[in-house]
Design a protein with these regions (language model features):
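Acetyl-CoA-dependent GNAT
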Residues: 5-82, 87-88, 100-102, 106, ...
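Active-site acidic-Proline motif in GNAT/NAT acetyltransferases
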Residues: 87-93, 121-122
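Alpha-helical macromolecular-interaction surfaces
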Residues: 98, 102, 124-125
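C-terminal "cap" of GNAT-fold acetyltransferases
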Residues: 3, 113-116, 120-133, 137-157
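Short coil/turn segments at alpha/beta junctions that flank glycine-rich nucleotide-binding fingerprints
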Residues: 93, 109-113
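Loop/helix-junction capping segments adjacent to catalytic residues or to phosphate/diphosphate-binding pockets
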Residues: 11-14, 93, 124
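Conserved phosphate-binding and hydrolysis motifs of nucleotide-dependent enzymes
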Residues: 62, 66, 94-96, 134
Length: 157
């Protein structure tokens, strides 16, 4: 059974978030220091907390299965999807799709009008998922030094 929990600054699940973020980075096998990833792991709510952010953890039969986050960008009405991750053992249950839907709903509630994301070209299942939710390829909206980066955006949240 799937359960998605919105994480608050005082949530006991913050340690679960940290662990999921570390597993995400480990699976990517990329250096994320250009994104201040260490600081993000230390205090996820600084980047993804209220009033302009959101952070969710998915549980499958009460086992942590994945996460997703949202942060505000500098442009008015624009947010960014971050850290979509589902543990490999849970990838057959539609958890990634449910997390994306939860984040889109949160972005609407926070009155964002568009959402951006970046991903790696080699992550084709993720790109296909984003396309199913109306994300389109765009030019780079920030400098990402990793090879094979793909930038996407969805309007009208």
């Amino acid at each position: 059974m799937l359960r998605i929990q919105k994480i608050s600054p005082d949530s006991a699940a913050l340690e679960t978030v940290r662990q999921l973020f570390l597993e995400y980075a480990d699976e990517l096998q990329e250096n994320l220091c250009f994104q201040s990833f260490d600081a993000e792991v230390k205090d996820p709510m600084k980047k993804y907390g209220p009033p302009k952010g959101a952070l969710f953890v998915a549980y499958w039969n009460e086992s942590p299965a994945g996460c997703i986050a949202l942060q505000a960008l500098k442009e008015e009405g624009v947010c960014e999807m971050k850290r979509l991750y589902v543990k490999p053992a849970f990838r057959k249950y539609g958890i990634g799709r449910a997390l994306v839907e939860q984040l889109l709903e949160a972005s609407h509630e926070l009155q964002y009008t568009s959402m951006r994301l970046d991903t790696l070209e080699r992550l084709q299942p993720a790109i296909k998922l984003y396309e199913q939710y109306g994300f389109k390829l765009i030019n780079a909206y920030y400098e990402n030094p990793l090879p094979g980066v793909v930038y996407m955006e969805r309007h009208e949240m």
